[in-house]
From Swiss-Prot:
This is Mediator of RNA polymerase II transcription subunit 13. It comes from Kluyveromyces lactis (strain ATCC 8585 / CBS 2359 / DSM 70799 / NBRC 1267 / NRRL Y-1140 / WM37) (Yeast). Belongs to the Mediator complex subunit 13 family. Residues 354-367, 390-400 have a biased composition (Polar residues). Its main location: nucleus.
Length: 1387
């Protein structure tokens, strides 16, 4: 591999997801400030401009309105009228800025311009996409019309120094889906679109959350249309839901992730369209493994064999023949396709007749469901909860009803691996639809009973109707619950049925089949002619008591090949009847009945009934009662750095209390001891306090602008508020007479139909938006301008408002959630529904230190279970489709940028060397040799570490003995030190203690034995640490913390008796112990991780070598420069969670000799955060004191963001330290910029992966000319031509940007792994030189990942201390904790 890349790498073959929009010379702007501080003039003015022209570049900043134009384009004009007198507001500030703006702090006009640009793009995309794209926060959501799945679509604009106005287009999968009653779960988080604010459902039953439209619904829909391009004005049957918003998120603070699903504490609510609500499911929710769209081949094969086996057994064991039929008419079964002519035997009696029969199949279960896969102990059994995974889906049109014939599985000697479902033959005519219905009801209602036992009968009825609409699930429940539920559902006959089934079924005799057994099914035949589909259950009145009617004329029924005890119900006494009661009145068929009571309850209230019942009862609530308006907590935070937090207006902008509004600015959720202070009310704006905004002039050069203006001519009602003035301008009668009457309901319907009938495919692994993908604009449609111009509001659809105050208060309530845009960065990628917790108290720090050590230096053991963030994926091709058409209409030059246009230099970074010992000699080897240490007989260069090992377990005793023996032998063979297997008593095994349980009493007794043993050992030999091994059954954070708490009981007791002795913990996966094929390399990695965790922890297995300088530079007075030469570097990487609850930091010197990782619980407290910053700086100074000369601290902040409050503390601390120079760097491996590798020749190892169609070229035949390399360790450095804006900060830009990249392994892998590095300050040094040095040191520190046991393969090109912080934060953010003092007791 060349060390000088030169021309070997073709930069033009590196494709980006950046697109050029315009070539900018200057950006012009006007700033408008309202004359009064207590009005909503800025909001109304922006809506006025956006209604006038959807392409306007305008945005709000606090109470200010900013308007922009590019180059020589005119600025938007505000032509308003006051009392028919023309008056144009004058801008408070005029100016312009050029691409050569200051860095790293971006000017305010630039940040607001980027917001206005992104807003304009989203509005026009929404208008031109048939509403498949909806704005969401500072991003937008693409909704596939035929599924509920969505993808985040993000546009990240940036203005380069060379004048290129660019935008990075990328996508991200947050797992969002539309709010749906059928798929709604308890473990979901709900967000509002277009604001992206976190809200909560008041009830898990979505039907209870549906409410009538608010009184200002039409005004809201109009504002939504103009402000975001979302047209819901003419949507029929628009549903509204009542939601509880999160006040902290509205103020720019992410809700605590570990409590993300906790019930809301506030009583405020907001009413929102249900179609604009999106849900995100917790990552630890169990989902069915197979669905109707993805089936296991093994599952289908088992289905086929089960069907064949059941059919053969049925033919051999048929019991009786149907009267009037024959079995010898040319076939085995005769003319009757339902008869097999065999004999029934007792083996049918184990078949459970309460199986769910849906989708033309039936689940065959054993007694009490013991053979159901859901309750099977067989690990190979897969529970099928979704009936979509049926064997066959026969069209219901082929039969007169959806009933079916059930054929049980006979082979009871083999444990089933799947639901034994047998599908009917297509020619079968179902005969007993009524019994099929009853069995469906039993299983469907079982689901409801298992969800919530407190649900009333009315709620259960609603749930049951919902269950009828979707396939029912076959879920077995406990025997007692099943009996009680059948009794409530069907009366005493079901009791006898269940009790009979629960007995020993081998003693039940098979009765002779007679015509009486078909009485119940006989009644159902009459209803069969009027009901085309018995499984639709549109009317629950089909579920009635079976024995209430008299027997009708009996006829010969076609014989069914189903056991008698399965298809029939024994004769039972009728339900209780009062002889003195009047005759019941027959209920109409179309009236829904309750299935939860044996008697129908149909009260008829006469005219003289008590008024309290007539009005709905004593607890009824008048529907006309108005709720109190929502109250917002006002935040004083001006230090948020997440994209639009500062550029958006705060809820205080909607508070019209004048001077008293400032009193609400004392709330800061970062201080736990300060309560939230909310504004009492949001008074409406006086009617005459502002000028009424009239309809803008219709004359325009752009037809789209003129057609867009016609929306204002459609509202002719009197103005009730200044917000109404935007929609209802005051026009004279003569002017009204001249307005054309436009009606376009049909156009809107056509647009809606076209959007639903246009199936689209979203991004693949390598997104490419071509003609056949999501943005294909093949459907004919009107332009966005015509679409807007066709809107006509029916005046009759607007609800009459009782008072102006009520309407205005509702407008004040809903405006913040409509016009506020939360940054996507403030939403967690993943969250859990079951969060572990750490006990607060004096032992909290010790437990947190142990947890951090287990996460970082344990061979990335929790990498599979750890909830990782979703990655941004750039859009590679966007040349055809809606995006391309929209962007070409908005901008004059929409074209893709290639690598040679944004990359200044690419250089190869060689693999670092490390120190190790072989025999007694210290040698240097490549860092990738870590994977071959067991073959090279290497040992650490900094001495050996001895320890005692003891495994504590309650299971797998023999496996644990084998493990501890193998581990001890491996540790000694690699000369890492000596491992002694501890034996507490003579009766114990070496290195193993087998416990009955991990109760606290058992652990305390064990700790006493350990103290006794170590006390004797310490008196004879030097202090040797005791390492406790605890196997865990599941690689989860919850299990890890549970075992750490158990270990802490032992450690606490141990330390109280022997404070100078060391006792450590090492968690081991139980599968690692039990697997007999665990490779020796896994044991080697484990032993190296143990070595790194033994005291002193700063001493690791290896360290980086010192590179000899290639040339010596002499600094004299003549060539002296202002740049400072740094003799040593200290690296500090840290990350604070987005909810501000946790902070993790890691230190390392340039050689990896000094290393340290620590985690703090900040608790969203400003005081606590300041203390943590002081602790970090104190540790840093201790490391700096060990170095000489000028020391540079490379302060690395992850997540490509640097909040203002953090920067303030670093400046405060660095000013007081003269000998330590601070270089602030923001890094991230998940940024919006994506690079695609289309170079077929570079790097040279790509030639080894060529296919037959593309043969290998340029490979030498001599093996001596080749070098063995690890492709994962081949890293290059990259310097961008222009500095990049921070990915998650709208107002900060780097002074120099670069990246560590790892090229694709072959031609097919297009994505280039990228670790973006942005230098924010350069203390007395050249920025390019300093950035290259930092990239080089980052690459060297990345070589320590496998040696330190931090990462293998995936993140090996990222520095180890950055990977360590990221791994800790991905796990620790889901842990609950607090500062309260509590006593924690182990169960």
């Amino acid at each position: 591999m060349k060390k000088e890349v030169g021309d070997a790498c073709r930069l033009e073959d590196i494709v980006t997801n950046l697109y050029r929009l315009e070539t900018v010379k200057q950006i012009n702007y006007h700033q408008y400030v309202p004359s009064k501080a207590d009005n909503q003039w800025s909001i109304q003015a922006e809506l006025f401009l956006r209604r006038k022209n959807p392409k306007v570049l305008a945005a709000l900043f606090s109470r200010e309105l900013w308007c922009f134009s590019i180059n020589d384009d005119p600025l938007p004009e505000l032509n308003l009228e006051l009392n028919n007198e023309s008056e144009s507001p004058q801008p408070e500030r005029k100016g312009h800025f050029t691409p050569e703006f200051s860095k790293p702090h971006l000017p305010t006009p630039y940040a607001i311009f980027m917001k206005a640009l992104r807003r304009m793009i989203y509005v026009n995309l929404t208008l031109s996409s048939n509403e498949t794209i909806v704005p969401f926060g500072n991003s937008c959501i693409f909704q596939e019309s035929y599924t509920f799945s969505t993808k985040i679509l993000h546009f990240d604009p940036h203005l380069f120094e060379n004048g290129d106005l660019t935008v990075a287009i990328c996508s991200k999968d947050l797992g969002l889906s539309k709010l749906n009653a059928e798929s709604l779960k308890h473990e979901v988080a709900v967000y509002l679109a277009p604001s992206g604010i976190r809200v909560y459902l008041p009830s898990t039953d979505l039907k209870k959350c549906y409410v009538s439209p608010p009184k200002n619904a039409q005004m809201f829909l109009k504002t939504l249309f103009v402000s975001h391009g979302i047209n819901l004005i003419d949507v029929d049957g628009l549903k509204w839901v009542k939601l509880i918003p999160n006040a902290n998120h509205l103020n720019g603070f992410t809700p605590t992730i570990s409590h993300y699903l906790d019930e809301p504490k506030g009583n405020n609510f907001v009413i929102w369209p249900a179609c604009l609500c999106f849900v995100q499911t917790a990552s630890d929710v169990q989902t069915p493994q197979y669905t109707a769209f993805s089936r296991s081949p093994q599952l289908e094969l088992d289905d086929c064999f089960d069907m064949i086996d059941g059919f053969i057994q049925l033919k051999l064991t048929s019991a009786y023949r149907t009267p009037g039929t024959s079995a010898g008419m040319g076939t085995v079964t005769g003319h009757n396709p339902l008869s097999t002519g065999g004999i029934f035997t007792d083996q049918f009696q184990g078949f459970n007749k309460h199986s769910a029969n849906n989708s033309n199949n039936v689940s065959s279960t054993g007694e009490n469901g013991k053979f159901s896969p859901e309750y099977s102990n067989d690990p190979n059994v897969t529970p099928l909860r979704d009936n979509k995974t049926s064997r066959q889906n026969f069209p219901t049109e082929s039969y007169s009803s959806n009933g079916f014939i059930t054929t049980p599985i006979i082979n009871e000697n083999i444990t089933p691996t799947v639901d034994d479902i047998i599908t009917e033959t297509p020619s079968v005519k179902p005969q007993n639809d009524l019994w099929n219905e009853k069995k469906d009801v039993i299983n469907s209602t079982s689901n409801i009973n298992s969800k919530d036992a407190s649900v009333g009968s009315s709620e259960r009825k609603v749930e049951l109707e919902t269950a009828f609409e979707s396939p029912a699930q076959n879920i077995s429940i406990e025997e007692h619950e099943h009996v009680e539920f059948d009794k409530d559902l069907f009366g005493e006959d079901s009791d006898e049925d269940v009790s009979t089934r629960n007995k020993n079924e081998e003693l039940v005799s098979v009765k002779e089949i007679t015509d009486e057994m078909f009485d119940l099914a006989e009644d159902d035949d009459e209803a069969d002619g009027s009901t085309s589909n018995s499984l639709k259950f549109d009317r629950p009145d089909t579920i009635e008591s079976i024995d209430t009617d008299e027997k009708k004329t009996r006829t010969k029924r076609t014989y069914l090949d189903i056991p008698v005890d399965v298809i029939t119900i024994e004769k039972t006494p009728t339900l209780y009847e009062d002889p003195g009661a009047p005759l019941p009145i027959e209920t109409p068929k179309d009236r829904k009945k309750s299935i939860f009571a044996p008697l129908n309850f149909n009260p008829i209230f006469e005219s003289n009934v008590d008024n309290k019942y007539k009005n709905g009862g004593k607890f009824s609530v008048n529907s006309n009662t108005n709720d109190e308006p929502i109250q917002f907590g006002i935040s004083t935070s001006n230090i948020s750095s997440s994209e639009d937090d500062d550029s958006d207006f705060s809820p205080a902008d909607f508070n019209n209390n004048g001077p008293s509004a400032g009193k609400g600015l004392s709330y800061d959720p970062r201080d736990n001891d300060i309560p939230m202070i909310e504004s009492s009310t949001y008074e409406p704006i006086a009617k005459d306090s502002l000028p009424e905004l009239i309809n803008p002039p219709s004359s325009s050069k752009d037809d789209s602008v003129a057609s867009y203006n016609t929306i204002g001519t459609l509202m002719e009602k009197p103005v009730k508020s200044n917000l109404d003035a935007i929609w209802k301008p005051a026009l004279s009668k003569s002017e009204r007479a001249d307005l054309p009457n436009q009606t376009i309901n049909g156009v809107i319907n056509d647009c809606n139909n076209s959007s639903n009938s246009n199936p689209t495919t979203y991004f693949e692994n390598t997104p490419s938006l071509g003609p056949d993908t999501l943005y294909d604009n093949s459907k004919p449609r009107s332009s966005s301008a015509n679409f807007l111009s066709t809107v006509e509001i029916d005046p009759k659809s607007e609800q009459t408002i009782q008072t102006a105050e009520q309407e205005q208060s509702e407008s004040s309530r809903i405006l913040p959630y409509l016009l506020r845009h939360m940054p996507l960065f403030s939403l967690p990628d993943v969250f859990l529904c079951q969060n572990p917790s750490l006990p607060p108290g004096k032992d909290f720090e010790d437990i947190l230190e142990i947890l951090t050590d287990q996460i970082v230096f344990n061979n990335d053991m929790f990498s599979d279970d750890r909830a990782t963030e979703s990655q941004f994926k750039g859009i590679k091709d966007c040349s055809v489709g809606t995006i391309s058409d929209t962007m070409n209409q908005l901008f004059g030059n929409f074209s893709k940028l290639h690598g040679n246009e944004i990359i200044e230099e690419v250089f190869y970074l060689p693999e670092p060397s490390v120190f190790v010992k072989k025999s007694e000699d210290t040698i240097k080897i490549k860092s990738s040799s870590c994977y071959f240490t067991e073959y090279l007989n290497l040992k650490p260069n900094r001495g050996v570490k001895n320890f005692r090992a003891l495994v504590l377990t309650t299971e797998a005793k023999n496996d644990c003995m084998s493990f501890v023996s193998q581990m001890s032998q491996t540790y000694s063979n690699h000369e890492l030190g000596f491992c002694e297997l501890t034996k507490l008593t003579n009766d114990d095994n070496k290195g193993l203690i087998y416990l009955k349980n991990f109760n606290q009493d058992t652990l305390l007794l064990l700790s006493a034995q350990i103290v006794s043993f170590c006390s004797t050992a310490l008196s004879n030999i030097k202090n040797i640490p005791l390492l406790i091994f605890l196997p865990i059954n599941k690689l989860s954070l919850t299990e890890c913390i549970s075992m750490i708490l158990k270990f802490h009981v032992i450690r606490k007791e141990f330390k109280s008796k022997l404070p100078k002795a060391d006792i450590l913990l090492r968690l081991v996966n139980i599968d690692f112990l039990k697997n007999p094929l665990t490779p020796i390399t896994a044991y080697t990695s484990l032993c190296m991780a143990i070595y790194n965790s033994l005291p002193p922890k700063s001493t690791k297995v290896t360290s980086l070598t010192n590179d000899l300088p290639k040339q010596i530079e002499f600094r004299t007075l003549k060539n002296a420069s202002l740049s400072i030469h740094y003799d040593n570097y200290i690296h500090l990487a840290y990350l604070r969670s987005i909810d501000r609850e946790w902070l993790c930091a890691a230190w390392s010197d340039t050689k990896g000799v000094e290393s340290f990782v620590k985690t703090w619980y900040v608790g969203n407290s400003r005081t606590r955060f300041e203390q943590v910053c002081n602790d970090i700086w104190k540790i840093t100074l201790q490391l700096a004191s060990k170095n000489f000369g000028n020391v540079c601290l490379v302060l690395t902040r992850l997540d490509s963001v640097l909040p203002d409050d953090e920067l303030i503390h670093w400046r405060r601390l660095s000013v007081a330290t003269k000998d330590l120079h601070l270089a602030v760097v923001c890094v991230g491996d998940n940024t919006k910029l994506t690079l695609f590798d289309e170079d077929k020749t570079y790097p040279t190892f790509k030639n080894l992966f060529r296919t037959k169609s593309n043969p290998q070229t340029g490979i030498s035949n001599s093996i001596d000319d080749l070098e063995i390399i690890n492709i994962d360790e081949e890293v290059h450095g990259l310097i961008f031509s222009n500095p990049l804006q921070l990915a998650n900060s709208q107002h900060r830009c780097a002074i120099k940007s670069g990246a560590l990249i790892r090229f694709a392994k072959s031609e097919g892998d297009n994505f280039i792994d990228k670790f973006e590095v942005n230098l924010l300050n350069c203390p007395h040094a050249d920025s390019s030189t300093l950035l290259k040095e930092i990239l080089k040191q980052y690459r060297n520190l990345a070589g320590l990942n496998p040696w330190f046991g931090v990462s293998y393969g995936k993140d090996n090109f990222i520095p180890w201390h950055v990977v360590a912080v990221k791994n800790v934060m991905n796990s620790i953010v889901h842990v609950k904790s607090s500062f309260e003092k509590e006593t924690h007791i182990i169960d």
